[in-house]
């Protein structure tokens, strides 16, 4: 491509300050440095994590190019990059896999030591590894976000945060594999390890929660109870495999008590994809005594209280990061599984808009009217 080695001027949505609409601006994207790849973003989505970062309580750095769920095409590569070439279809992600560190070499985790280069692994990654940015606008340096920054027509990522995928992949669907689908689906398959014939409860029916429902279904769960305070999400949950749907606001007793009654003692597996203090407690309480397992997928609170009695009686709580998948190795396989119709991503996509309408996509999400909105340039 004629742009290799040159600064690219393109369109981006920049967050200049907290709690404000994103601004469509021209941005300059520098060429990739060593072990970096510059990507032309084809499709991206808005995830709640992107918008939560603009909350003043998060103390994010501004201005910043948000976005971390996308798919695109390699425009150019930096020195030392051997696994990618211009024209490759790729999916970037916030969970790196360097394949060299102690964590990457262990089969016990999907974390990577590269996360230690950043203040907080799933939120910041606000600069490249040399502690500089590849973005400028209006003569100001612009921060990166979660190692991806997909709200720009071109972005630069580390090769450890990138996977090459099938040349025939539909980028307007497999972009969901960059975060939301993979996190929820893997939470059920890899972390909870849902078993055939088991009973499951999934709290929160956004993209991650609905993907967890898909995972429970594929794992062979015989009962999948989906919980959300927005009943409009229930038809989609049932279409994806939920057997029961509960809205806590419609019940005359705590939802965990209702689940315990429905299942004759509690579910084998619960997955909290909402992450509030209330859902965390309910997700633990609704599991069966003796072996009940609660997997924490989303977390909007920094701390949770767990009864030691619950632990003594056999209940367990575990967390999951990127669905337990080793990212570089697993993302291409997930794309192949989608191509082979092992699961359907179409039901997770509720809207499609041009990138210029990104603030409309955010409004749809905040109003609970969308699961995922695909944005294209």
From Swiss-Prot:
Subcellular location: Cytoplasm
Entry-linked InterPro entries: ADH-like_C, ADH-like_N, ADH_Zn_CS, GroES-like_sf, NAD(P)-bd_dom_sf, PKS_ER
Documented EC number(s): 1.1.1.105
Enzyme class name: oxidoreductase
Pfam families assigned to the protein according to its UniProt record, in alphabetical order: ADH_N, ADH_zinc_N
UniProt: Zn(2+) 2 binding residues: 98, 101, 104, 112
Means of activity regulation: Oxidation of 20-HETE is inhibited by low concentrations of N-heptylformamide. Oxidation of 20-HETE is a decreased by 55-65% by either all-trans-retinol or all-trans-retinoic acid. Strongly inhibited by omega-hydroxy fatty acids.
Assigned keywords, A-Z: Cytoplasm, Lipid metabolism, Metal-binding, NAD, Oxidoreductase, Zinc
Binding site for NAD(+): 48-49, 204-209, 228, 233, 297-299, 320-322, 372
Domain of life: Eukaryota
TM ranges: none
MF terms (GO), sorted A to Z: alcohol dehydrogenase (NAD+) activity; aldose reductase (NADPH) activity; all-trans retinal binding; all-trans-retinol dehydrogenase (NAD+) activity; benzaldehyde dehydrogenase (NAD+) activity; NAD binding; NADPH:quinone reductase activity; retinol binding
Cofactor binding mode and count: Binds 2 Zn(2+) ions per subunit.
Summary of the tissues where the protein is detected: Liver specific.
GO cellular component: cytosol
Binding site for Zn(2+) 1: 47, 68, 179
Subunit structure: Dimer.
The protein's role, per its UniProt record: Catalyzes the NAD-dependent oxidation of either all-trans-retinol or 9-cis-retinol. Also oxidizes long chain omega-hydroxy fatty acids, such as 20-HETE, producing both the intermediate aldehyde, 20-oxoarachidonate and the end product, a dicarboxylic acid, (5Z,8Z,11Z,14Z)-eicosatetraenedioate. Also catalyzes the reduction of benzoquinones.
Stated family: Belongs to the zinc-containing alcohol dehydrogenase family. Class-II subfamily.
Designated name of the protein: All-trans-retinol dehydrogenase [NAD(+)] ADH4
